[in-house]
């Protein structure tokens, strides 16, 4: 499990990634679990994740996916099982980074916690 330093994130205590490389095709693992904990446990009531792919050579990025809701585990902790098939255009690449940003909101839907855009902590590869 890898952790990203909490100081990089506005309103986040921690962000953990269960595995840093996922595959599409017959190889395992095909998903990673993202677990995020917020500092403001009383007011952050929902969280969404945005994803795009970044080519490791050219650094060109795809468009962002529509927001994917994360599961509220209680106590300011949210999780998402991210599968390769959840990301737009995943089959167009053999070896790319999955770039992501997490956004936590209050009951009115106002963003009150947001990570930086994280680019190189998850690799997506075609099954060799």
Task: Identify the meaning behind each predicted range.
Residues 1-128:
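Glycan-association/targeting regions that enable binding to alpha-glucans and other polysaccharides
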């Amino acid at each position: 499990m890898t952790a990203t330093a909490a100081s990089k994130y506005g309103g986040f205590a921690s962000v953990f990634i269960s595995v840093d490389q996922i595959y599409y095709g017959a190889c395992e693992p095909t998903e990673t679990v993202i677990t995020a904990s917020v500092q403001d446990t009383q007011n952050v009531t929902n969280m969404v994740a945005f994803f795009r792919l970044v080519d490791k050579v050219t650094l060109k990025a795809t468009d962002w996916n529509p927001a994917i809701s994360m599961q509220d585990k209680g106590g300011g902790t949210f999780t998402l099982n991210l599968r390769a098939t959840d990301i737009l255009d995943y089959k167009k690449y053999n070896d790319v980074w999955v770039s992501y940003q997490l956004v936590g909101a209050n009951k009115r839907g106002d963003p009150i916690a947001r990570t930086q855009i994280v680019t190189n902590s998850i690799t997506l590869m075609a099954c060799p």
